[in-house]
Amino acid sequence: MLFRSGFVADLLIPGHGMPIVGAERVRQALTDTAEWLETLVSQTLALMNAGATLEEVLRSVKPPARLAERRYLQPVYDEPDYVVRNLWRLYGGWYDGVPSHLKPAPAAELGREILALAGGLDGLIARARALAALGRLALAGHLIDWAVAAEPDHREVHAARAEIYERRAAEARALMTRGIFSATARESRSEEHTSELQSQ
């Protein structure tokens, strides 16, 4: 619609990324971006209408490969799954399809139960570190977050959490993802230092 009205721009300065110069390149970038977003919307809605959970939608929705390769559509700031999460909220609300999330137990209680199942804090920390060593950083993050929820003042928990999230930040492509993981690691380094001072 924008281009049918005769609008032509020679320069596009996006919110994230490098400027795009030249009327044809600007037109291509805007058209590709619109198509990229439309495919995420249509895939998300189709899966939601089929009864998929948020996790299933997040694992299934992918931008078209030919568009995902475009330089201006690289996940530099955020990532496609963040767009999908926002589409889920827009069209489906906050409920993610997991019944226990409807009225969840407090994180500290859940963390303590996970600790009990793992045989204690040392076992959970060790397993999180072992998973991280295998490159399974997302799963390691879940385990260490449960450990922090259960024992928020424990020095070794924060040391492990910082290690895991520093690795996650180093592997992240998107600025938003890297920023959140880096902030988490810094927070735990600070907590680790505070716990060490308090124990002296």
Predicted regions and their residues:
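Short, small-residue-biased leader/transition segments that mark boundaries at the very start
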Residues: 1-2, 192-199
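Divalent-metal (often Zn2+) His-rich catalytic cores of metallo-beta-lactamase-fold enzymes
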Residues: 3-56, 60-95, 167
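TPR-adjacent "capping" and linker segments in tetratricopeptide-repeat scaffold/adaptor proteins
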Residues: 32, 99-123
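TPR-repeat structural position
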Residues: 54, 137-138, 171
